[in-house]
């Protein structure tokens, strides 16, 4: 709604093209938010064969003002094409380019809200002990959480939980930024090896004089993800893979061990 509200105000606005890359979830959300709106064209890039059939159907079957393009590559390749388009000033002006990816700050502003909502659901005495484990791919969600903390939300600590695409955990562990080829995993919305929000994360830590070493992290493989999903089901919670990864990382944070982990089955 935050993205689409301005386009609902008038059918006389200049035409806008929403160019978005998706690793699975964003595509459907964007397509349904803008579907049928006047003067708005949506172009969604996604990695061919690397999202689930259900996710693909959710945004590839609408037609109308929603166009989809399957890219022979991974999400990082899709994201690179979006960045390339936004670097072309003539193209931006001609098409009225905008985006629903986190390259657009309004995406993060909306995500800030549910951190406050989550904290509000806790008893007052528990809020200063809040540790949030964030399933992370492109790291926009974690960036939003850090922005919430910078606005005064009393979050004690964050945990960045990734799948096998572990560029950030390896960087935090060894100090070397060394992206590898993106791996397809059960948690496909997190299949990102070059998260473009990571510079924002580092900048927030720098500006707020927070120590990056306080950021917890865990890289969780598919077998461990499956085990976490089974454990959650056994206690009455039906989870999808992304949340299961975050839960596993949070569970590890409660054990008396070092604050950073790499899990194995």
Task: Name what the model sees in each region.
Residues 80, 84, 89, 93-148, ...:
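Domain-scale recognition of functional cores that engage charged ligands
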Residues 13-30, 42-44, 128-138, 259-264:
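A short, small-residue-rich loop immediately preceding and capping a beta-strand
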Residues 55-103, 107, 159-245, 249:
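Active-site/ligand-binding loops adjacent to catalytic centers
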Residues 17-53, 58-59, 65:
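Glycine-rich, mobile lid/loop segments that gate access to catalytic sites or pores
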Residues 3-10:
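Short, small-residue-biased leader/transition segments that mark boundaries at the very start
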Residues 13-16, 37-42, 63-66, 93-94, ...:
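Short coil/turn connectors at secondary-structure junctions
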Residues 19-32, 52-53, 136-145, 168, ...:
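Short glycine/serine/threonine-rich phosphate/pyrophosphate-binding segments
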Residues 247-265:
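C-terminal non-catalytic interaction/assembly regions of soluble proteins
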